[in-house]
């Protein structure tokens, strides 16, 4: 699952859509409370990969003539990331309710197919992007991308998929929206992980030694695989569009529906 998380968290193909299939094949001898927490906290490894790869662009301090100085452009970037995170904070209380009512084959398959079609439509109507550099992203752009990010609360949507579609519609270049999407993940995924851990502990649950080991290994694997996935996507979007991912999502959605039908029959 660490491999699945590391790949699917950054590519706009829905980590949930893949997780729901993996869980059909790989049966974990763990409580549902742990699995609910595990699916989210494993993202910490993926977040660390972003920090490592983009450290120079994310750290707001530097050295000039032997003295520590601030980087205004980096601070501006972080303020825009915060602006994009605000809509998520508003809807975050609905997260557990959405998972309880919509974490199922039909919802996941529907979102996979819907956003697959959206990718194809958006790419077919693409014009020359008006934003090609991160510093050109306005606070309005950031806030609207944050609104698109809220749609990822529906299982099967894909956080990166929603923000990339939103960014493309707003006129961001593929490389620009992909990189900004990576940065948005840091506060959102870190906050979601912390919230899941707190709920797990407050709920009276305790991890076994095996579960601690599983979580640790999952995070490490997600980190390593994320390094490769992020590098791949940044290189890919410089030369290609997102149509392949749109088609992939549609095919995966059909597979999820087939698995749902087979599960219901057998």
Please give the residue ranges for each predicted region.
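Multi-pass membrane proteins that catalyze or facilitate reactions on polyprenyl-/lipid-phosphate substrates
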Residues: 1-266
């Amino acid at each position: 699952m660490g491999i699945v998380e590391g790949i699917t968290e950054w590519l706009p193909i829905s980590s949930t859509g893949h997780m729901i299939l993996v869980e059909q094949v790989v049966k974990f001898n763990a409580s549902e409370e742990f699995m609910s927490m595990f699916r989210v906290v494993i993202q910490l490894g993926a977040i660390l990969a972003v920090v490592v790869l983009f450290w120079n662009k994310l750290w707001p301090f530097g050295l000039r003539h032997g003295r520590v100085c601030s980087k205004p452009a980096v601070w501006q970037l972080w303020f825009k990331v915060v602006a994009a995170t605000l809509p998520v904070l508003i809807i975050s209380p609905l997260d557990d309710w959405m998972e309880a009512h919509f974490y199922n084959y039909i919802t996941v398959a529907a979102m996979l197919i819907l956003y697959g079609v959206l990718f194809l439509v958006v790419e077919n109507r693409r014009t020359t992007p008006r934003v090609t550099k991160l510093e050109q992203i306005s606070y309005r752009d950031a806030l609207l991308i944050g609104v698109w990010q809220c749609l990822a609360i529906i299982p099967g949507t894909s956080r990166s998929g929603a923000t990339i579609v939103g960014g493309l519609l707003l006129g961001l270049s593929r490389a620009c929206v992909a990189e900004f999407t990576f940065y948005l993940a840091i506060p959102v995924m870190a906050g979601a992980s912390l919230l899941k851990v707190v709920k797990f502990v407050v709920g009276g649950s305790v991890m076994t030694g095996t579960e601690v080991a599983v979580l640790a290994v999952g995070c490490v694997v997600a980190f390593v695989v994320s390094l490769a996935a992020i590098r791949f996507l940044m290189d890919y979007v410089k030369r290609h569009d997102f149509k392949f991912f749109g088609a992939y999502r549609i095919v995966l959605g059909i597979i999820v529906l087939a698995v749902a039908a087979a599960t219901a029959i057998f």
